[in-house]
Amino acid sequence: PLDGRIKTKRPDTPEGPGGEVEMRLSTLPTAFGEKMVMRIFDPLAAVKTVEQLGFGAAESQRWAELISRPHGIILVTGPTGSGKTTTLYATLKSLATDEVNVCTIEDPIEMIEPAFNQTQVHTAIDMGFAEGLRALMRQDPDIIMVGEIRDLATAEMAIQAALTGHLVFSTLHTNDSAAAITRLADLGVPSYLIAATVIGVLAQRLARTLCPACKVRDEDTDRDALDELSKPWRMSGGVRPYKAVGCLSDCLYSSEQHVQGTGREMTT
């Protein structure tokens, strides 16, 4: 098995020069030959602002209040590909100023952001998350982002950073916000330290939305069935169904250009 990354450039267009695109590659030998998976990252499209994440007004307000806290641990949870890193990057970018030292330890560095001091995990030289976090503590950080809390050593270093007055962001692979507490306890973190340092958890998913440039009203929908289905949510003004069409200019006929974040927050 091999992992690697390739950087290339999009073709120039009449609107301007093509930007840089990064491709993340993973290969695996199988019974029928080499299998390859490629993930394409557009740095300009990936780094969003907090307002572009797609959360509702109430969730955005609670998140803004949470990240304004001076110290503690804030966790973002969800399955692989649910937008955890994008949320963290957008949040850190909103907090990074000339007076704020934002440091990250990642594996791998998903997107290069000049506003952060980013460090790559290197297991070959015995620098994992815990070792990298220990080194970051001597770099006078104000805000720290740990790519993922995978073991007790990393959790202990994150807790130590929070107890010494730092704001720490990290991710966990759990299905909901409450399970993040259970996950930390399973790693061996004492409950009193969890209560003293974890100030909030955001459980996140991605929901596809239709391309706003080409979607059209669906007049063939069974209104009675739709009203019955949407009754528990008490939507004001009723539900207006749309259907996918596809266009060349915005969604390249995929009909699903936009992906919107949904989240459930738990604060302490």
Feature names for model-found ranges:
Residues 1-82, 87:
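N-terminal "pre-motor" subdomain/linker immediately upstream of P-loop NTPase catalytic cores
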Residues 2, 19, 24, 32-34, ...:
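A generic structural signal for well-ordered coil/turn residues at beta-strand boundaries
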Residues 15-17, 30, 42, 68, ...:
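A generic structural signal for short, solvent-exposed coil/turn residues
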Residues 40, 52, 123, 204, ...:
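Active-site donor-binding loop signature of nucleotide-sugar glycosyltransferases
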Residues 78, 107, 263:
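Active-site glycine-centered loops adjacent to acidic/histidine catalytic or metal-binding residues
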Residues 174-268:
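Cys/His-rich Zn2+-binding cysteine-cluster or related metal-binding knuckle/ribbon modules and their
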